[in-house]
């Protein structure tokens, strides 16, 4: 089986379950990252173990998911060795979590004696060393891509475990030197695990590049599913550093994922567009925006028998906005074919569209098959009023049957809540691609993670991370470029001195609340960052180069530019400028962090 015809092998409940587990783990982590964890730490461990370690089955499913995507099998010896290691790790982690739970429940001195300290140190060290010794079993030569989801989940558990030495090490009786050694190890492994995941994600993606529409569908499935189970996870690794993040962290994932085209591969009979046409046509790296309006165009498709004629979604415009409170409306180019029927406008204006359910139909002629999307119901949620509702595009002629549901590919974060609360992704863009021979259009929907805050609210209690791609506008000479894979989204790049961007922020705390700022950056030269509020400079400092010209961006390419002077957010528009760049230099900017100062 080749990449061009492997698409249908992935349609299974197993794949949906694997994706749901990956989404659930990331969602749980987003709720607890940063310190102090308090009682939430043991609760997280318990939920995590129940999600991925109720048995060995989830780990088998992680492996089978990538095997199906790559159309390749892991050798029995390698799979059996990995599963045996995972069983041992499960035993070690469960023993440690049980001891940690008892430790937290019994703060009195009689319980926390040298014996109990020694016991929890022993269990922690056993679990931690077992991870170090087991990780090579999830990176066996020739199977690195197939083990990648397993590797990422195991790496996440190891790093999350390691940070406990910084929280409890002194209580447990570790010497300061031992605690420092654990911290050094955590930093080293964060870099090692992150770079491994990015490298082998890209290797797998490149292997799936093809020429046909069918190969693009499989390529995009790999990109989407590995984003959900690997790249989203590694974006959170730095937040386990409790020395850098001594408070809870409010963060978000701004990357896009594309669901499968609504028109199924089997219905196209070779009439889909080409791999390069669809890949070159999808959105390039861009400033983050949210869905405002879709204008649907409709055409009539006659059928050979007459009664199989139907209307279909033939094209669309999309309108978006950069952030809540902005009056700017960005209108897309037109996608598809213009309407021969009245257009339909659906306006969302910031409500979270968390599900799309589509109807399709076919018209069969002796020489061809014509396929089209006839109806789409969009479920949306207003998180300000706590109300759910639906809007529908309806072609109003022979709409056929439901054949596509976004939840099958982007399952909810949790099933313990109604879908409008437990959903994982929200719609932010739609496109249409023309089939070959003018046989209809292929709609494709783009989604972003529910963690994104459309208001850019700065929390007065937590460290707030905002991606600089959420800027409302860019300085001349600044561009949005593809992220390196571990940042949770795209990043900004500048090659000359000047203003990088303007970021609109909002606060609910009193204006007297002060903050410090850090910028996550990579630079080929020593630079000076200048911060201004509504045009008035308030912070300026120089920072070291982090990379050489021509270097590929890896985890250690980035550093944190920390400003020590606290300030009050007396304005809404934050400008970031840079000087110190010469010809050939580049500075990359990922996120800005706002740290509340008491």
Briefly describe each language-model feature range:
Residues 331-337, 341-598:
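Extracytoplasmic
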Residues 10-74:
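Membrane-inserting effector segments that mediate pore formation, membrane fusion
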Residues 109-448:
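Membrane-inserting hydrophobic helices used for pore formation or membrane fusion
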Residues 45, 70, 154-155, 517:
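Long, contiguous hydrophobic alpha-helical segments, chiefly transmembrane helices and signal peptides
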Residues 50-107:
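Heptad-repeat coiled-coil amphipathic alpha-helices that mediate oligomerization/assembly
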Residues 1-9:
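Membrane-active, amphipathic/fusogenic segments and juxtamembrane/transmembrane anchors
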Residues 15-22, 59-63, 79, 93, ...:
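Short amphipathic alpha-helical segments that mediate assembly, nucleic-acid/protein binding
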Residues 8-11, 15-19, 480, 566-571:
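Intrinsically disordered terminal tails
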């Amino acid at each position: 089986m080749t990449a061009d015809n492997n698409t249908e092998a992935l349609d299974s409940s197993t794949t949906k379950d694997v994706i749901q587990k990956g989404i659930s783990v990331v969602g749980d982590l987003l709720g607890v990252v940063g310190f102090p964890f308090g009682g939430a730490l043991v609760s997280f461990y318990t939920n995590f173990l129940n999600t991925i370690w109720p048995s060995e089955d989830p780990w088998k499913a992680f492996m089978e998911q990538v095997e199906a995507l790559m159309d390749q099998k892991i050798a029995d010896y390698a799979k059996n060795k990995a599963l045996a290691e995972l069983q041992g790790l499960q035993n070690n982690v469960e023993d440690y979590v049980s001891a940690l739970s008892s430790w937290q429940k019994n703060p009195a001195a009689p319980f926390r004696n040298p014996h109990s300290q020694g016991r929890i140190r022993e269990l922690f060290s056993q679990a931690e060393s077992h991870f170090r010794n087991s990780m090579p079993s999830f990176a066996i030569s020739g199977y690195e891509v197939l083990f990648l989801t397993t590797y990422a989940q195991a790496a996440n558990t190891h790093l999350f475990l390691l940070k406990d030495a910084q929280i409890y090490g002194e209580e447990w009786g570790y010497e300061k030197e031992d605690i420092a050694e654990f911290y050094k190890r955590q930093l080293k492994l964060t870099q090692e695990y992150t770079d491994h995941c990015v490298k082998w994600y890209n290797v797998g993606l490149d292997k799936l590049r093809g020429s046909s529409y069918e190969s693009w569908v499989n390529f995009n499935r790999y990109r989407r599913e590995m984003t959900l189970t690997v790249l989203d996870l590694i974006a959170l690794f730095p937040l386990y550093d409790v020395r850098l993040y001594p408070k809870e962290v409010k963060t978000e994932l701004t990357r896009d994922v594309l669901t499968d085209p609504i028109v199924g591969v089997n219905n196209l009979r070779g009439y889909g567009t080409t791999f390069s046409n669809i890949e070159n046509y999808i959105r390039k790296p861009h400033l983050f925006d949210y869905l405002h309006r879709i204008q649907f165009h409709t055409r009539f498709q006659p059928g050979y028998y007459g009664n199989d004629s139907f209307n279909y979604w033939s094209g669309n415009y999309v309108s978006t906005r950069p952030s809540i409170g902005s009056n700017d409306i960005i209108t897309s180019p037109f996608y598809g074919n213009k309407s021969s029927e009245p257009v339909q406008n659906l306006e969302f204006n910031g409500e979270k569209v968390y599900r799309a359910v589509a109807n399709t139909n076919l018209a069969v002629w002796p020489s061809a098959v014509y396929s089209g999307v006839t109806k789409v119901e969009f479920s949306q949620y207003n998180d300000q009023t706590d109300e759910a509702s639906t809007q529908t595009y309806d072609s109003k002629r022979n709409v056929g049957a439901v054949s596509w549901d976004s939840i099958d590919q982007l399952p909810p974060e949790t099933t313990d809540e109604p879908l409008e609360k437990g959903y994982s992704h929200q719609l932010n863009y739609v496109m249409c691609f023309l089939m070959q021979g003018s046989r209809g259009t292929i709609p494709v929907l783009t989604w972003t993670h529910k963690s994104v805050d459309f208001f850019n609210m700065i929390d007065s209690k937590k460290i707030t991370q905002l991606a600089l791609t959420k800027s409302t506008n860019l300085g001349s000479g600044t561009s949005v470029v593809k992220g390196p894979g571990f940042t949770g989204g795209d990043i900004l790049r500048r090659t000359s001195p000047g203003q990088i961007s303007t970021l609109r922020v909002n606060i609910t705390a009193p204006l007297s609340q002060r903050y410090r700022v850090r910028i996550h950056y990579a630079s080929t030269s020593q630079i000076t960052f200048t911060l201004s509020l509504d045009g008035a400079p308030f912070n300026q400092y120089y920072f070291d180069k982090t990379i050489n010209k021509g270097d590929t961006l890896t985890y250690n390419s980035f550093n944190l530019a920390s400003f020590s002077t606290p300030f009050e957010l007396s304005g809404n528009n934050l400008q970031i400028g840079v000087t110190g760049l010469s010809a050939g230099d580049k500075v990359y900017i990922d996120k800005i962090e706002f740290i509340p100062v008491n």
